[in-house]
């Protein structure tokens, strides 16, 4: 466990940083005042490549750990199986690789495979109870963002959200963390778990990083990612070719990485004929400079240099 590095309002501010929303901030503030163990969890379907999108989630778990939370990482092997990600053996092997990557990022956590408890009798009965308490339309809506690419969804896509809600109960979770694509499932858990005699979880939703091609989210299946174990040449080449439209911020993956990963202030070194050297004290200044005409290649070079510095130690530990 990390020693506390923040306290009081600073602790809440650290947890809020770089999140899309917390439901609710008032509940989080009250939880931070309480004594005793507090549990925060996030679930990951084992994935072939751990990338910056995953790392953004892990950074938030580290923030929570520094605030005194016990961290549980659910390696959701049964969820991945229901989502047609491979055989259980293949998924478990990926889970072990993912665990090593998360540990290499500096996260100290309890790692739990879903199959370790999701096949138990009590868990199964609770899934049935949730099925009785949830309308079919409500369950389908909760999976819309997660399964939107599936043209012919299976019945499993309705079971999936019920299991995820049940995970929160059976892992004794106080705070559920995920990307914005998890919001509908988390809201379902807040709505339905109190009716089963369990507390409503506080929910932290993090941004979804745009893929390097500018089309949809950063994803292992699409290959539009920077993996945490990419080498220096690969990182430079990927950023060189990344979608980064001049003066446009919205949906710009390079600017998103600059927002969530760069350590400010930053220096951009340029010849005098191109405006000379530039010092940017925060992301807001970088965004303003970009809108005013800072060249995409200057930003790409800056982001590549800092990402290499951040990811090199992680890559070395993963080897």
Curated annotation (Swiss-Prot):
Catalytic activity: tRNA(Tyr) + L-tyrosine + ATP = L-tyrosyl-tRNA(Tyr) + AMP + diphosphate + H(+)
Binding-site residues for L-tyrosine, renumbered to this chain: 41, 160, 164, 167, 182
SUPFAM superfamilies: Nucleotidylyl transferase
Main location: cytoplasm
Protein's UniProt keywords contain Glycosyltransferase: no
GO BP: tyrosyl-tRNA aminoacylation
Name of the protein: Tyrosine--tRNA ligase
Organism: Methanococcus vannielii (strain ATCC 35089 / DSM 1224 / JCM 13029 / OCM 148 / SB)
Gene giving rise to this polypeptide: tyrS
């Amino acid at each position: 466990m990390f020693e506390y590095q923040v306290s009081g309002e600073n602790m809440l501010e650290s947890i809020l940083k770089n999140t899309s929303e917390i439901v609710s901030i008032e509940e989080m503030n009250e939880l931070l005042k309480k004594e005793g163990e507090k549990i925060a969890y996030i679930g990951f379907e084992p994935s072939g490549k751990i990338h910056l999108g995953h790392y953004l989630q892990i950074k938030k778990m580290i923030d929570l750990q520094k605030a005194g939370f016990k961290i549980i990482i659910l390696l959701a092997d049964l969820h991945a199986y229901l989502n047609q990600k491979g055989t259980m053996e293949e998924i478990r092997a990926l889970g072990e690789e993912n665990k090593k990557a998360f540990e290499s990022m500096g996260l100290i956590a309890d790692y739990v495979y879903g199959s370790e408890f999701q096949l138990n009798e009590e868990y199964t009965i609770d899934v049935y109870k949730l099925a009785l308490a949830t309308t079919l339309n409500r369950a389908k809506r909760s999976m819309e963002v997660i399964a939107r690419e599936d043209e012919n969804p299976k019945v499993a896509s309705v079971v999936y959200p019920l299991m995820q809600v049940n995970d929160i109960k059976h892992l004794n979770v106080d705070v559920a963390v995920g990307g914005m694509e998890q919001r509908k499932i988390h809201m379902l858990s807040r709505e339905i778990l109190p009716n089963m005699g369990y507390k409503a979880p506080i929910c932290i939703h993090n941004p979804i990083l745009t893929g390097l091609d500018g089309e949809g989210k950063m994803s292992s299946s699409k290959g539009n990612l920077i993996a945490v174990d990419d080498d220096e040449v690969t990182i430079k080449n990927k950023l060189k070719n990344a979608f980064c439209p001049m003066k446009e911020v919205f949906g710009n993956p390079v600017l998103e990485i600059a927002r969530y990963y760069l350590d400010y202030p930053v220096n951009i070194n340029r010849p005098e004929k191109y405006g000379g050297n530039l010092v940017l004290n925060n992301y807001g200044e970088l965004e303003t400079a970009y809108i005013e005409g800072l060249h995409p290649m200057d930003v790409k070079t800056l982001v590549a240099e800092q990402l290499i510095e951040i990811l090199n130690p992680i890559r070395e530990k993963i080897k």
